[in-house]
């Protein structure tokens, strides 16, 4: 590594000779970082808060703050990704991320006691989940909008020792002095037990008369496991904790090798190659290769198989896949402002279109002249869907859930 007069790192070279460089402003803020052909440029305000990040010249993320230095919005290429609102004690009381708004209510100890979401009926904000806490800050009760209640009990170390679901069924838990879970008893009295060694590694798991065992080396790497059915598997590792050998119950052994950055170079007879950004470039097996190409944002752009078949991909600046092309067959995707698929086309002809509710659930899907309409309850559980063609109902399905 190389440093400037202020002892700030300005150049680093990793084990494979890939080079990173760094630049700083007079306040010590990192203003530029390069790694091989990738570049990130940062801009700060007078309070040294990051206000703009430009990646590879095209991907621009901007950040806004309130007078107290709290982040209130984040935009990517002028599209708002996240916005936040706070109360007087800096609790986030509202967060909107990709169009979905969630509001939070807190108690005097800053525990979130209510989670509010847009109602699927009228769009108004409703408390979908409410939470109660004990004096130690453990969540002891969850209650949803339909009055379904989950209750929890804890020991002195805040380990959950019992959970009662909305139907009254109880699951119980026990722990050792190091807070490792040693026993789980289901509502049907089924019991799972766990034992640990002095390093908190699981060495035995038992259920009724069946038992699985585990052994470890001095570095706490798992080296042997015997399943409940007597199947044995063993493992070996290098000095970096990377698995170098795996032996199956039938005696078959698979060996592994790695490069200086810890990336897998081989797995049995399979071979792998990577670029500087850890993207898989090539996978070889039995003298056949699959090759991969990427754009400057590490999105895969082409796959070429051993028979010279090519699949090409395109992406927008937000990381959404916009096109897949295979031979003369092209599938195109468009997205709404919240990065959800809006339309799908095949060879230029619209194939499917989607609409969404205020929660981001798929509300309808139109494909090949058939429309599927979906309904959900306030817990985002699907309650029904109907397939129609014109004015004719083709099929209808409804769902019911425990506790309703």
List where the protein language model places each region.
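Beta-strand elements of repeat-based all-beta scaffolds
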Residues: 1-14, 18-55, 59-144, 148-165, ...
